[in-house]
């Protein structure tokens, strides 16, 4: 769409929708809020949900629907994990799976405020997409920390007509405001939502019990091992055997968690030299080992109780710094990894140890993890202070709640 069409048609129309919806809420005395969820690891709204639920002026609902990019197996696993998660929390769920017109079913809830999991125009490819629900107060909390200089995402319909975009830092707001057709007027800086999760104690230990005290190390490989583009990360191909050998070698000193990207399994199943059977056996050996385990769900408690991490994932290169623990990024070419990153992404990565070889990984385990020789500790702490501490001395959830209250004139 042309910038002029956004400026003179879509954005003014969105503001009219917002004003009308807010007047209806004020007249009614309460707001109906719906959280649309497609993946449990991307569910960053729990503290916001809990804070709104404590105020009787908000009537909350959760609706679940899979991303179209999921394979059938991924879809079934994702939806089942969401049903189980919300059932344990006694949160009623509107299950939109299998609906031919999920947007029409969602409209039966008549949401005033609608939180989306991603800000893309054609997220689902049906009437659940944001252009079909633009008469609502659309909100978005980024599911990951923006790390690149890419501008295309900000030019989407959603980002320009949404009522609120809740960003993590002034840096992110300033960058987006230069690109958005609405000049970022709908952006509010509240801090990274992960900060709320990391500030609370672990509910229960995720790590497998050991007979003796051991260091806890996470290995989190990305799935883009066959992508030859800018985001190609192939460290799994040269570390898969090495990491298992090290898990065996350090059996008495370290316990390892294999935390693969959710899509890695399906990629390996289709990869020559791997296939479904080899992939299944590989995952199973990590799950069943005495000092190893497989984790595919939420990772905050896993991070908080760990001592270090080895990975090549984008968002983890910032999020793991909430722990303050040493972390290694595995790549043969770190210059390529940081090339397209913004200040947040670049500085987060530069606060990592770099694993370019099996020997680098071994040195990291021996010197940093086991002996505690950690020369990058101060650099990590400075990064956390610069980018990860929420503003105003409030939790992220409280800042979002207060902004919604103010925006609705409650």
Question: What does each of the following model-derived ranges do?
Answer:
Residues 2-20, 142, 157-234:
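A nucleotide-sugar donor-handling region in carbohydrate enzymes
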Residues 34-198:
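Active-site and donor-binding regions of nucleotide-sugar-utilizing enzymes
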Residues 44-54, 193-281, 355, 370, ...:
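Conserved catalytic-core segment of nucleotide-activated headgroup transferases in glycan assembly
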Residues 63-67, 117-119, 142-144, 192, ...:
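Short loop/turn segments at strand-loop or loop-helix junctions that form parts
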Residues 92-99, 291-296, 349-364:
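Short acidic-hydrophobic, aromatic-tinged amphipathic segments that line or gate anion-handling sites
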Residues 140, 295-339:
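A donor-sugar binding/catalytic signature common to diverse glycosyltransferases
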Residues 277, 325-372:
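Nucleotide-sugar donor-binding patch of glycosyltransferase catalytic domains
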Residues 358-410:
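C-terminal amphipathic helix plus adjacent low-complexity
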């Amino acid at each position: 769409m042309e910038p002029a069409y956004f400026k003179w048609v879509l954005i003014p129309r969105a503001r009219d929708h917002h004003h009308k919806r807010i007047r209806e809420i004020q007249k009614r005395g309460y707001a109906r809020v719906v959280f649309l969820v497609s993946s449990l690891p991307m569910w960053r709204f729990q503290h916001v949900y809990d804070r709104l639920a404590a105020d009787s002026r908000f009537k909350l609902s959760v609706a679940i629907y899979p991303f179209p990019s999921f394979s059938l197996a991924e879809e079934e696993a994702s939806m089942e994990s969401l049903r189980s998660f919300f059932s344990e929390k006694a949160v009623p769920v509107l299950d939109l799976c299998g609906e031919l017109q999920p947007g029409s079913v969602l409209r039966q809830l008549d949401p005033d405020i609608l939180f989306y999991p991603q800000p893309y125009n054609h997220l689902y490819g049906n009437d659940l997409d944001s252009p079909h629900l633009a008469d609502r107060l659309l909100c978005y909390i980024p599911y990951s920390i923006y790390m690149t200089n890419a501008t295309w995402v900000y030019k989407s319909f959603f980002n320009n007509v949404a009522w609120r975009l809740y960003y993590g830092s002034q840096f992110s707001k300033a960058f987006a405001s230069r690109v958005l057709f609405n000049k970022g007027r709908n952006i509010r800086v509240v801090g990274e939502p992960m900060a709320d999760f990391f500030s609370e104690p672990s509910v229960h230990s995720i790590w497998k019990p050991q007979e003796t005290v051991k260091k806890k190390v996470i290995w989190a490989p990305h799935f883009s091992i066959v992508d030859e583009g800018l985001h190609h990360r192939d460290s799994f191909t040269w570390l898969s055997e090495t990491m298992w050998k090290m898990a065996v070698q350090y059996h008495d000193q370290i316990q390892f968690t294999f935390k693969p990207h959710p899509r890695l399994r399906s990629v390996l199943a289709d990869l020559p030299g791997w296939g479904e059977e080899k992939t299944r056996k590989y995952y199973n050996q990590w799950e069943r080992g005495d000092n190893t385990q497989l984790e595919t769900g939420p990772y905050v408690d896993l991070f908080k109780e760990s001592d270090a991490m080895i990975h090549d994932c984008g968002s983890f290169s910032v999020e793991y710094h909430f722990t303050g623990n040493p972390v290694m990024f595995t790549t043969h070419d770190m210059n390529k990894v940081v090339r397209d990153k913004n200040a947040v992404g670049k500085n987060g990565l530069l606060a990592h140890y770099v694993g370019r070889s099996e020997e680098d990984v071994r040195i990291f385990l021996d010197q940093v993890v086991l002996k505690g020789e950690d020369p990058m500790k101060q650099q990590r702490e400075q990064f956390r202070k610069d980018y990860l501490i929420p503003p105003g001395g409030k939790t992220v959830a409280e800042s979002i709640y207060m902004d919604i209250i103010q925006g609705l004139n409650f």
